[in-house]
Amino acid sequence: MMQDSLLELKKLLGTIKLHNTCFSVLPTVLKSSTVNDKDFITNSWTNERIFNYRSNIISLYGCFEQFIESSIKEYFNELLKICHSFTELDESIRREYIDRWKTLHGRLHFNKFQTITPTFMVKSLYNSLVKDKNEIIAECFLQNGGNYKIEEIRKSFSTLGLTNLNETLRNYEPLVSYYSQNGFDNYSKIDEIVDRRNEIAHGANADDLLSESIVLDYVDYVEMYAESLTSYLNDQLLEHKWKIANPYRIIKPINFYTRNSVVEFHEKDIILREKMDMLVKKPKDYFPRYVREKLPPFRAKKAQASLSAIKNYNELYGDGDWMFSFQTNYKMTTKFRIALYLS
């Protein structure tokens, strides 16, 4: 599952947080210096704050842009583990790919694409279109040139078949908790960061400086947005797996015990192994909707047997009708479905 892009962003944001924490106490520390030093600090402090503000915004947006593009590439890398053929990819990706491949081929002189060779591009295109392998080049979808406002982010991910990003993202933690307290603002802080970055890049006067505490609020918001986006993308990957991967069996719960944390199933001719792969599909109003898990320890008995026949199992090759149950970390309903995979 996706996590590398988020971890790298958190590391970079941590550097910005530490800098602003230090910068906010710097005047107090420096004023304890000599009189001459205090005069120098007082006279130059406005310029220092302007430079600090510009550095913060440029750094923050740079981290965010890097995260968005890294997430797109990581999403494709994870797709390789799910979609083993070109035809298994979303229609939007297949429809856009050739034109974007052509555009990338003409931009290989850009610094960000210099590790990609024409030979590699031709080989990957041949393997994808002729041999039906999933060897798409993620960089084909990284050609917007930056300025990742909310609408640009939406467009970037819509080419991957993810058309409901802006409508759905706010339902994932931690944004859902943030917006429940502050009201939904259409992710406006992201656009504000981009606008401020563009003003600085084009030499506008810094008339509207942000305090270190407000900068840290922006940093915290970017981190929340990134966490929710990563959860959303992982959910989309698991949804794709649900659609195309062939499970051994899809089961549904029939009974619930101990405040719904123990779920019971009734299946015929079932094979169960502790720690076998499971993919849980929740109803539409749950976020995230898909959860990848391992089958926990379970108990089972023949369907017609008495309750005293229930035993603990690590592995079961059950001919005929069987009842089995296991404990979960959350409540299920009869609308939940669980896909079981033997390998």
Show where each model-derived region lies.
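Helix-loop junctions and short alpha-helical segments
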Residues: 59-60, 72-178
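Inter-helical turn/loop segments and adjacent helix faces that build the functional surface
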Residues: 206-212
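Charged/polar positions within long, soluble alpha-helices
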Residues: 21, 28, 65-76, 198-205, ...
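Generic structural signal for well-ordered, non-transmembrane alpha-helical segments
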Residues: 7-10, 14-17, 58, 62-66, ...
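Charged alpha-helical initiation segments
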Residues: 1-58, 70-77, 82, 88
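Beta-strand/loop-dominated core regions that host nucleotide or nucleotide-derived cofactor-binding catalytic loops
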Residues: 245-343
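Conserved aromatic-histidine-acidic binding/catalytic patches
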Residues: 44-60, 64, 181, 185-188, ...
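Amphipathic, Lys/Arg-enriched alpha-helical patches that create a basic surface
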Residues: 147-194, 198-199, 212-243
